[in-house]
Amino acid sequence: MKIAVIGSGISGMVSAWSLHHAGHEISVFEAGTYVGGHTNTVAVELAGKTYAVDTGFIVFNDWTYPNFIRLMEVLGVKSQPTTMSFSVHDPLSGLEYNGTSINTLFAQRRNFLRPSFYRMIRDILRFGREAPLLLNNDDTLLTIDEYVKKNNYSKEFIEHYLLPMGGAIWSAGTAAMRTFPARYFVQFFKNHGMLSVDARPQWRVISGGSASYIKPLTEPFKNRIYLNSPVQSIRRDHCGVTILVNNEAQRFEHVVIAAHGDQALRLLSDPTPSEQAVLSGFTYTRNEAILHTDMRLMPRRRLAWAAWNYRMGTDESALVPVTYDMNALQGIDAPERFLVTLNPNEPIASGRILRRISYQHPHYTSQAVAAQKRWHEINGVNRTYYCGAYWGYGFHEDGVVSALRVAKALGAEILTQSTRVAR
């Protein structure tokens, strides 16, 4: 069959790969200048050497990424273990800590004397014990903010641990995290061993940068990928699908929309009531990622430096401010420390900036979670199929799973989907 795939992020690439290997004639349309979406590795020249630095997709783990890992094995792509430490720095109060060890937890020695700091630690342990009970009911409307306040968790735990941790994971600001569905939040934490102090998955990175998997994944159909080709509209009829690209109408038998949910809705010339209802449930937040070498964005104390570093601000409506230490995450040995900061709330020295990139991340609400459950109502209807990480938690594994689900619906089950969450 002649099938159009719109979008070349992980979902678009995997669906195209599956459909191509099943013998279908595919065309992949990408609005941007490169293939990969959030898989965006930047080549940095420094002192005569080139360093591959990731700026979007960085890590995966051996518990909750079974389909992505299987795909990498099939493609022969190598990976390596990494560290996933987390720090919080509050410029207003001066508080900072790194949760890796007792020594780094008390990197700021004053924390030994702070009763509020011990309250936070106590509530971290308490949350690990009590939060899983939330999974025994089906309340999808309760927000994480309502849950912790209802159960009398301390302000220190909420503001200096839970909201920063969630914000760093989902690239969401404090106000957005407060409205995050509690059950969804806890399920993710449980799946990833984040409610335990010892049983944790092994996190990994793609050797040589995340983009290393793009060539082997897209090589079989590289001549069918069209960059700088934003789709303007999609019109469906009984005989096929008409896609308008660069003011040129092209006909296909089916279309796979691997763009964001809100983008998918805008592209449809004739959305059904179900498509309108489901896709309008997904909203996004635009985050600016800056690749730089300005160490002022890291915690003040060297002992508090972590792989992920959350810098608190005073405006809860502001976007998430988090800095990733790419040398630590990717094992980069360079004379400079490469950092990626999302939405800096401290000015970065202009001479230290290497690249600016804009990403959009799903904003999870009870409406979004409800919309996810209605995928079957719109997928395959009017010759249109939907995939994207937004159908899950918003990560690479979710993108792969959604693509395999679409491929199966089109009779192209090249890689059998696994639902395993290793424990």
Regions found by a protein language model. Name each.
Residues 20-45:
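Glycine-rich FAD pyrophosphate-binding loop
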Residues 2-28:
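N-terminal Rossmann-like FAD-binding beta1-loop-alpha1 element of flavoenzymes
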Residues 62-182, 186:
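Mobile amphipathic helical/loop "lid" adjacent to a hydrophobic cofactor/ligand pocket
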Residues 186-245:
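Helical element adjacent to the flavin cofactor pocket in flavoenzyme catalytic cores
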Residues 11, 34, 262:
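Conserved Rossmann-like nucleotide-cofactor binding loop
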Residues 22, 230-362:
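Mid-domain catalytic core of redox enzymes
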Residues 42-68:
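N-terminal glycine-rich dinucleotide-binding loop that anchors FAD/FMN and/or NAD(P) in oxidoreductases
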Residues 43, 100-101, 317-423:
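Conserved flavin/dinucleotide-binding core of flavoenzymes
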